[in-house]
Amino acid sequence: MEIFIEVFSHFLLQLTELTLNMCLELPTGSLEKSLMISSQVLQIPVANSTKQR
């Protein structure tokens, strides 16, 4: 479980950096869209991991 948390937090960090880098190049209106997309992407692996247990 701890390994999963480390991997997940590392993935979250990379995703946040990627989102911020994208937002610097895009207009501010797309910031909300990219945040919505990233939150949807994060919900999928969490749901899958709970089903596997």
Curated annotation (Swiss-Prot):
Listed GO biological process terms: activation of immune response; cytolysis; positive regulation of type II interferon production
Which sequence ranges form a coiled-coil region, renumbered to this chain?
none
Superkingdom: Eukaryota
Cysteine-cysteine disulfides: none
**Tissues where the protein occurs:** Highly expressed in dendritic cells and primary leukemia cells, especially those of myeloid lineage. ACC-6 expression is limited to cells of the hematopoietic lineage.
Signal peptide range: none
Give the function comment from the record.
This splice variant of HMSD is the precursor of the histocompatibility antigen ACC-6. More generally, minor histocompatibility antigens (mHags) refer to immunogenic peptide which, when complexed with MHC, can generate an immune response after recognition by specific T-cells. The peptides are derived from polymorphic intracellular proteins, which are cleaved by normal pathways of antigen processing.
Q: How does it assemble?
A: ACC-6 forms a complex with MHC HLA-B*4403.
Q: What is the recorded name of this protein?
A: Minor histocompatibility protein HMSD variant form
The record's gene field reads HMSD
